[in-house]
């Protein structure tokens, strides 16, 4: 078993190398239909498996096509990792779509909507109470 420090260093190295491959190495047209970025890499403790989380910007169809292209390119990505990274064994690569950015945007939109729907009277009542409290302290 590798130490946590080594696992995190290998994960960062894989993230950097796969990002470079997405820019220059993968020639599959399906991968280019959506803008792809590597958001995170989880490497198992024995360094045998790497889950690569990707964020894809584009339509739902482009996301499906891009994921299909990435899944078909896993063999290429693994062999390139073996050539670029010095490890005893090259980890198995699994691409997973990261939807955390979409979920974050939805949460921000909901919070903005709640803030917008709040009646202004509540805000004025709070402000009036603070002014009265301030006067009582100055006496």
UniProtKB/Swiss-Prot annotation:
Compositionally biased spans, kind Acidic residues: 128-139
Main location: cytoplasm
Gene Ontology BP annotations: maturation of SSU-rRNA
SUPFAM superfamilies associated with the record: Ribosome-binding factor A, RbfA (SSF89919)
Keyword presence, Cytoplasm: yes
Keyword Cytoplasm: yes
Keywords assigned by UniProt, alphabetized: Cytoplasm, Ribosome biogenesis
Function: One of several proteins that assist in the late maturation steps of the functional core of the 30S ribosomal subunit. Associates with free 30S ribosomal subunits (but not with 30S subunits that are part of 70S ribosomes or polysomes). Required for efficient processing of 16S rRNA. May interact with the 5'-terminal helix region of 16S rRNA.
Family: Belongs to the RbfA family.
Official protein name in the record: Ribosome-binding factor A
Taxon lineage: Bacteria, Bacillati, Cyanobacteriota, Cyanophyceae, Nostocales
């Amino acid at each position: 078993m590798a130490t946590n420090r080594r696992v995190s260093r290998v994960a960062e190295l894989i993230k950097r190398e796969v990002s470079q491959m997405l820019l220059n190495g993968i020639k599959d047209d399906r991968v280019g239909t959506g803008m792809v970025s590597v958001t995170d890499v989880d490497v198992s403790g024995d360094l045998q498996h790497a889950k690569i989380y990707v964020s894809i910007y584009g339509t739902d169809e482009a996301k499906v096509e891009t994921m299909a292209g990435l899944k078909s390119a896993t063999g290429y990505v693994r062999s390139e990792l073996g050539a670029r990274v010095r490890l005893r064994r090259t980890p198995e690569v699994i691409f997973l779509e990261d939807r955390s950015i979409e979920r974050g945007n939805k949460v921000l939109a909901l919070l903005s909507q709640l803030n917008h729907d709040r009646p202004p009277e509540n805000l004025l009542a709070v402000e009036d109470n603070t002014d009265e409290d301030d006067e009582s302290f100055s006496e």
